[in-house]
Curated annotation (Swiss-Prot):
Keywords: DNA-binding, Isopeptide bond, Metal-binding, Nucleus, Phosphoprotein, Repeat, Transcription, Transcription regulation, Ubl conjugation, Zinc, Zinc-finger. InterPro entries: Zn532-like, Znf-C2H2_11, Znf_C2H2_sf, Znf_C2H2_type. Belongs to the krueppel C2H2-type zinc-finger protein family. The keyword Metal-binding applies. Signal peptide: none annotated. The lineage of its organism: Eukaryota, Metazoa, Chordata, Craniata, Vertebrata. It is found in: Nucleus. The keyword Endoplasmic reticulum does not apply. A zinc finger (C2H2-type) spans 587-612, 615-639, 711-731, 740-764, 768-790, 799-822, 827-850, 892-915, 983-1006, 1013-1036, 1043-1069, 1124-1146, 1153-1176. This is Zinc finger protein 592.
Amino acid sequence: MGDMKTPDFDDLLAAFDIPDPTSLDAKEAIQAPSEENESPLKSSGMCIDENVSLSHSGSAPDVPAVSVIVKNTSRQESFEAEKDHIAPSLLHNGFRGSDLPPDSHHCGKFDSTFINGDSARSFTSKLEPSKSEPLPTFNQFSPISSPEPEDPVKDNGFGIKSKHSDSYFPPPPGTVGGPVLEALSKFPVPELHMFDHFCKKEPKPEPLPLESQQEHEQGGQKVVEPHKDLDSSRFFGEALEFNSHPSNSIGEPKKLAPELSACSSVPPRQRLKPAHSKLSSCVAALVALQAKRVANVTKEDQPGHTKDSSGPTKEGSKGSPKMPKSPKSPRSPLEATRKSIKPSDSPRSICSDSSSKGSPSVAASSPPAIPKVRIKTIKTSSGEIKRTVTRILPDPDDPSKSPAESPAGSTITEAPSEAPGDEGTAMPVEEHFSEAGIHSGSPQGDRKGDENMIKTSDSSSPCRISGSRVPKGSALNSQASKKQQSTAPQASTPAASLLPKAVHLANLNLVPHSVAASVTAKSSAQRRSQPQVTQMTVPLVHQVKKAAPLIVEVFNKVLHSSNPVPLYAPNLSPPADSRIHVPASGYCCLECGDAFALEKSLSQHYSRRSVHIEVLCTLCSKTLLFFNKCSLLRHARDHKSKGLVMQCSQLLVKPISADQMFVAAPVNSTAPATPAASSSPKPSPTLDNASSVIPALPLYPDPVRLIRYGTKCPECHKQMRDYMVLATHFQRTTEETEGLTCQVCQMLLPNQCSFCAHQRIHAHKSPYCCPECGVLCRSAYFQTHVKENCLHYARKVGYRCIHCGVIHLTLALLKSHIQERHCQVFHKCAFCPMAFKTASSTMDHSTTQHPTQPHKPSQLIYKCSCEMVFNKKRHIQQHFYQNVSKTQAGVFKCPECPLLFLQKPELMQHVKNTHGVPRNVEELSSLQSSTDTSSNRPGSRAPAEPPATNVAARGSSLTAGRWGRPEAHRRAEARPRMRSTGWTCQECQEWVPDRESYVSHMKKSHGRTLKRYPCRQCEQSFHNPSSLRKHIRNNHDTVKKVYTCGYCTEDSPSFPRPSLLESHISLMHGIRNPDLSQTSKVRHPGGPSPQVNHLKRPVSRMADAPGTSNGATVSSTKRHKSLFQCAKCTFATDSELEFQSHIPQHQVDSSTAQCLLCGLCYTSTSSLNRHLFIVHKVRDQEEGGEDIVEVKVEAPDSEACSGEEVAMETKENGLEECASEPLVTDLGGQQGLALDEDSAQDPQNQPQASQDQNSHALSPQV
C-alpha cells in the first residue's frame, strides 16, 4: 500500500476528454497502427479483448447497447503480439506496481490497455516518451468516436509534451487514499462524451482555446502502474461502466474491471480501417463544447497534484459558464461532483458524481433527461476496492426527466463482499446507446446491425437494436453528415469501408468469446418500479465481418460496369413524306443512354440478345432470364420505383452463341409493326390512332351488298370512327391470353371481341361478324370472306422456346428442339457425382478412380439449358410442358406455301406480292374461270351460292359493267379454293383448319384414333409425311407421268423415273443410251392414255371425226420413224433388205449367231434363242424370219381396212380402253412398205400381222 502510486484526479478524469479540434488538420493522415504513437481518434485501432467479459445489468430487450467503452486508437494486432510479453508486476488496469521504478513520462498516462480495459496488455515499451496518446472516452457509440482516418496524431496537439509530467503522482508506498483523493480533486472533469452525443440542439460550438489543447493532452496521458495490492483501474473502469450503462448502480467491488476491459473493445471493422480517415464534424462540434467547459480548469490543474478536490470542481463549473442547462444539454460531471461528493470518513473512500444524457427509448417520444449518478470507491485495508454507482434523483429544475419517465435501473457490485450502496434509484441503460449507436444514419449499418443482433443469443446479449430506432431529423446528425460530405473524399474501398466512421451500435454483435455470459433478464415493470441489484456478465462486443460473397461482386459488376460502346444518337429529322412523328429527344433508353427515333427500335434495343443473365430475384421470388444488361437494369428500376432494392440470391452469367444472337425477337402483337400499334393495345377512335395504326385489311374488295362496313363493334358495342379503326380493334393483342384459345379448333385469338366473333362461326349464329376486320357478311358469303379474303384460318398457335425464342407450330417440335439444342445427356458415375459425355469416359473414370468397387453401368442424366438436371427422361419432358400456356404465341401461316409470319400484315403483303389476288370483280371472274378446271379436287367444297341480287330495277342507273356483277359474284362463289386447306370430316362434314385439330376432333367426336398424318382425300393415316406423300402420289395424284418401255411387246412395264426405264432397256434389251423422248406418257386414273394404246396398236385406221386429232397426231409422228434399227450402231432404215445387208458387218465370223431383228451377235445359239424369246418374243430364228415376212403384209392390210371401226380391248397397267373408240391414222404420209397382193388377198392374217408389227416394227422408233 505504501509504495503504491495513486493516479492524480486530473489525470483520471482527463481520460474522459477528447482532443482539441482547433489543432487538428482533417487532411493530414493519422499515423498507421504500426507506428508507436496512436491517435485517440483512429477507428482502425479499436479492438476487442477476447479474453475478458463484462458485468452488465438489465434485461436483453431493455438494453439496446451494452456498456462498451471505446478507445478509438488501439492496435489489436499489436495487442495480440504483446500478449505474452507483459511485465508480471503490472496491475490489471495498467498501473505500475511497487516493485517497478517510477517513470516520469508514463506514470501519469493511461495506457490504451487501461482505457480499453485490457487487463493483460501493455505497450510502454513501444511508446516514446515524447509521444502521448489522448484518451477519448465514451466514443464507441457517438459520432465523435469515429474520426475520419486521415486526422494526424501530431497535429492534434497531443504531441506537445507539456508540464503534465510534473503533475504525475509519485509512488509513495504508504499513502494511497490521500493521493487518490487529491488526484480526483485535481482531475479536470469534462463532459461525458457519450451523453454529449445526444445534445441535439446545442448552439454552434466555438473553437477551443489553447488551454483546452493542453488539457486534452492531459486526457491523453496514460499511466502504467505496478500491480501488487491496489487495482486502481477498477475505479476508472467503474466510471466507464457507469457511462456505458447508466442504469447500473455499482455495489459489488470486484468483478467489473475485467469485464469492463472487454466492453471497451471495438468491432473488427473499426480495427481494419485504414489510417487515412478524417475527423468527423461531430468531433469538432462536441470537442468545442467541451473545451469551453474546461478552459479555466486546465490552467489551475497543470502545476501539481496536491490541489484540493474542491478546487477543480469549482473551477470546472466556472470553466463552462456558457453551457446551457437545458434538459436537452448534458450536464457536466463537475456539477454532479460538486453537489454530491462529500469527504469520506476513510481516506480510501472516494465519491464522485457524474451525469449524462440518455437517448430516448424506443417508446419514448419526449427528450430524455440527464441522469445523475454517484460513483463511490472504497479502498479497504485488505487491498480490495469497492465501488458503488447509484442514481441521484434529478434536480427540481430538470423537468424533462421525471422519476416516472426514468425506469429504475439496477445495481452492480464488483467485490466479493456487498458494499453499502447510496440512496436513490438507478437509471436504465437502454436509452443511452440506442440512439448513439445508430446515429450515423447508415441504412446499411442498420441492416448489418440487425443481422448481427439476430445472431446473438437471447441469454448472452442484452442488446437489441433495430434500424427503426434511428432518430430522424437530428440536427447534430445532419450537421455531421454535411461536414463529412465536404471534408471526407469517397474511398474506393469495399462497401464495408464506405460506411460512416461513427461506431454504429447496429454494427456491433454481442457473442460470448472467452468468458461464459450470464444474463439476468428483468421485466421492464420491475426495472421501473424499484432499484435492483443484479450481477451479470456482458459478452464481448465485436462484429463478425463477413466478406461479400462472389455472387454479390458479380452482380455489382454486371450492374455497375461501364458501357464500352459510345452512346447512339439517331437522326431525329425524318423525311417529310414519311409521316413519322419523332419526339424532340427521341426514345431514350434510361439504362444506357442510347436514343432511338422509333419506339419499336427502343423495344428491339431492350430485346436484343448479347449475354445470358439468369437471376433469382428475391423480391419477385422467381428466376428471371435477361439477354442484355438494359433489360436487367430496367427490372431493377421497376423495383426501385416501388421503394425497394433489387436483391438476388442466384446469378448465372454466360455468353450466348452467335447463332442465338440474331434469332427473331418474340412478337406479342399481331398489329402492324409500328410504334403506336405496340404501345396502344386499345386504339381509340381518334385521328392520331387511325392514322398511325394500319390494320390488316381484306385482300380484295368484296362484291356489292355482300358485306356491310360498320363503325360499331358488335361485341363490346364500342363506337369507332371508321372501318379501319374497327379492324384495328379486332386485331389488337391483349397481354392476358387466358381464355382466348378456341376449344374446337385450338386457335389463339388476339382479344375477347375477336374470340366471341370466332365462336359464332362454329355455332353458325348471327350476326356473322368477321373476327379479323369486323365487317358483317351474309351467311352465304361469310365462309368465303373469312377463309379466302381475310385469311382468318391462317392464324396458328405457335410455341416459343423460352431459351432462344424460336417459335414452333407444335409442342412435339418444340420438345424435339429443346432436346436437340438445349439439353445435354451425361453418363453419371454410379459411385460419385462425376458425369461424362460418353459412356466410355465414365467407364475409364470408374476403372481409375473406383477400382475396388464392383462394376455398375453408368446412369443417364439429362441437363436442361436452365441448369436443372433430371435422372429420368420423363421428368425432363414434364419439365418442358410445365409452362406451355406461357409459351404460346400467335403466328400466321400462308395458305399457299409453308411460310410463317409473326404479324398479319406481313402475311397479307406476302400473299399479294407472291400469289396474287384479284383487284376487281372482272379480274375475280377471270381468275375463277382459269382455276375452274385445274383446282377441282375431291376434298374441296364450294360454298353455297348466295341469292342473286335484284338489280333490274336499278338498270337505268347502272353502267354496263355493273350489270354483270351478280353473275361474276356467283362465279366467284362457285369457284373452288386455290389450294385445298384443312380437313373435312367425312362423318359430320365439319371442316377443321389444321391437322392436329382434325386428329383431335376424330378422337373426341367419333372415337377414332388416327395416326399423325391423315390423308385429306381418304380415311387413311400414316406415321410419317413420306408415307403420306407416297400414298397421295400412287392413289390420288391426278396427273402422273410414267415411262413405258417400247421394246416390250406385251404388258409393257411403266417406270416413274426415266433412269429406271433406261436401266430396264439396257439390261433387258441390250440397248445402251436409248432415246427416251417418246417414252413419257401422261396417265389418268379414270381412263387409258391414247399414247399407250398407240404403242400397242401401231396401225390405226383413218377417221374424219374432228374430235380425234390426238390420234392423228400420234399416227403422223409414228409414220416418220424407221421400222428397222441396228442395235450395234445408229443405222436405221425402212427397208428390210437394206437392214439385212447392213447387220452382217457387225458379225465377227460366220459361226457367230446373229439376231436378224436387231443385229446383236451371240456366241451360242442358245443365247440367241434366249434373246429372241425375251426381247423379240419369238421362239427361234426361223420364227423371227417369218415375223419379218408378216410385217411386210401389215401396211396394205391396214390400208384396205381403212374407214372401218376396229373393236379391240387392250389392257395397259390395269386400264381398259373403250372398244368402240375410233382410231384415226393419217394415210397422207409416205408408205414405207410395198403392197403385196398375196397378203392383201388373205385378210385372215391381219390380226397376227398387227401383233408382229407391234413387236418388230416399233423397235426402231424407241
